[in-house]
Structures are given as C-alpha cells and as structure tokens.
Amino acid sequence: MWSFLKISLIVAMDKKRVIGKDNDIPWRISSDWEYVKNTTKGHAIILGRKNLQSIGRALPDRRNIILTRDKNFNFKDCEIAHSIEAAFKLCENEEEVFIFGGEQIYVMFLPYVEKMYVTKIHHEFEGDTFFPVVNFDDWKEVSVEKGIKDEKNPYDYYFHIYERIR
C-alpha cells in the first residue's frame, strides 16, 4: 500500500510499557529528548491531537502531521489528517516518517512500521498510557546503546533500534 514510504516509530517506555500519565511523560531524561530531536529532525512526524496538546507546540525542524477525528481542529505550524491514508498521503514525498504517539496512534500505525527506535527505561512508573504489546520475535535488534545515568538522566535506560523481519 505505502511501500514507497519508510515508516518508523520512536518511543520511550518503562519496564511495564508506560509511556504517559495524565497527558504527560512521567520522567525527565534529557539525553532521550536529545536523541528524539536528533533522530527525527528533518523528517515528518505523525502524532495524535492529545500528544500535540500535551507538548503544547509544533516541534521545530520537522513536519508535524496531526491525526485527529476532529474536523475543526487546527494548530499553528501543523498539518492535519483525519485518517491513516490521509496522513500517509501527506508524507508521500518523505524519505522516512516517524510515528510519534500517543497510545492510539502507535496501535493504529504499528502494522505499517518497519523500524522502531525504542528507549527502554529500567524503572517502573505510574501510568495511564501504554505502548502496545509487541511480539519481538517479529523484530531484529540492530542496535543497543546504554544511556548515561547522571543528574539530568536519573534512571538506567537503553536506546534500542529494531527492524521488522520480513
């Protein structure tokens, strides 16, 4: 269907797949945010309306494509799509697009994803938003790097990259 488009996702999650609580991220790891910025810079990102509203602004140096059912939704410096197909159509000239969450967006797009950039935080947080269950037998880990724990990064965490096995 969209074989011309490289579809990746990027996510940080804890040991129980928590990705959020009360429309926010329950941790602060500055090097993960740097990793996200550097990885997605210059690319399109697809995210849900709630995720955008929790961030509060379009992310600079990348196309922000917002998937929402709200036909009246508008947001400065963002493009709006009302279906997966419409979001992909907006990205047809992109080299790589990143699925940026939240939970419902990950669930909807996971079947199309070829590559996952996953920061795994070795801690358990309270949460109400989760990354979907993934059968990692269908994925090959191509990279893993331990993050540096310090005062700005107070948890053990690892950057993993997985590619779907075809």
From Swiss-Prot:
The pathway this protein participates in, as annotated, is: Cofactor biosynthesis; tetrahydrofolate biosynthesis; 5,6,7,8-tetrahydrofolate from 7,8-dihydrofolate: step 1/1
Q: Which GO terms describe its cellular component?
A: cytosol
Per UniProt, residues of the DHFR domain are 6-164
Binding positions (NADP(+)): 11-12, 19-24, 48-51, 67-70, 100-105
Q: Which Gene3D superfamilies match?
A: Dihydrofolate Reductase, subunit A (3.40.430.10)
Top EC class for this record:
oxidoreductase
Catalyses: (6S)-5,6,7,8-tetrahydrofolate + NADP(+) = 7,8-dihydrofolate + NADPH + H(+)
Give the signal peptide as a residue range, or say none if absent.
none
Please give the biological process terms from Gene Ontology that the record holds. Answer: dihydrofolate metabolic process; folic acid metabolic process; one-carbon metabolic process; response to antibiotic; response to methotrexate; tetrahydrofolate biosynthetic process
- EC assignment: 1.5.1.3
Q: Which CDD domains match?
A: DHFR
Q: List the disulfide bonds.
A: none
Keywords from UniProt, A to Z, are: Antibiotic resistance, Methotrexate resistance, NADP, One-carbon metabolism, Oxidoreductase, Plasmid, Trimethoprim resistance
Specify which residues bind substrate according to the UniProt entry for this protein. Answer: 10-12, 32, 62, 119
User: Does the keyword Protein transport belong to this entry?
Assistant: no
Q: Which GO terms describe its molecular function?
A: dihydrofolate reductase activity; NADP binding
User: What biological function has been recorded for the protein in this entry?
Assistant: Key enzyme in folate metabolism. Catalyzes an essential reaction for de novo glycine and purine synthesis, and for DNA precursor synthesis.
Misc. comment: Confers trimethoprim resistance.
The entry assigns this protein to a family as follows: Belongs to the dihydrofolate reductase family.
Protein's name in the database: Dihydrofolate reductase
Q: Which organism is it from?
A: Staphylococcus haemolyticus
Gene of origin? dfrD
